[in-house]
């Protein structure tokens, strides 16, 4: 695994990826503790005050919300708070 990065940097990069419609590799936990892999998903919007980002699967158009503080890996980097 690569060098760890701060969550604020991750959020900035997700906003940029959403602006340019670039795919990301993201791993996060769900509220119940299960892991979810969002490899190849495109960030749509983020709400810094609400603490969520919406991601879209470009293959089928499915949209999901991810809680920012539950992200533990971004593009191969581990994430710390």
Residue ranges and their predicted role:
Residues 36-38, 44-51:
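Acidic, low-complexity, intrinsically disordered interaction modules
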Residues 30, 57, 73:
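Acidic surface patches and DE-rich sequence motifs
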Residues 23-25, 39-41, 68:
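Conserved beta-strand residues within beta-sheet cores
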Residues 43-45, 65-80:
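Structured surface patches comprising rigid loops and adjacent beta-strands/short helices at the edges
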Residues 1-14, 36-41:
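Charged, amphipathic alpha-helical segments
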Residues 19-30:
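A short, Trp-centered hydrophobic/proline-enriched beta-strand micro-motif
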């Amino acid at each position: 695994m690569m060098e760890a990065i701060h969550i604020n940097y991750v959020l900035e990069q997700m906003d940029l990826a959403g602006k340019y419609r670039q795919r990301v590799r993201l791993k996060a936990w769900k509220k119940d503790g299960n892991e979810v892999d969002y490899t190849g998903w495109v960030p749509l919007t983020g709400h810094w005050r609400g603490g969520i980002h919406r991601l879209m699967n470009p293959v089928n158009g499915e949209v999901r919300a991810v809680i920012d503080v539950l992200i533990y890996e971004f593009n191969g980097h581990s994430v710390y708070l």
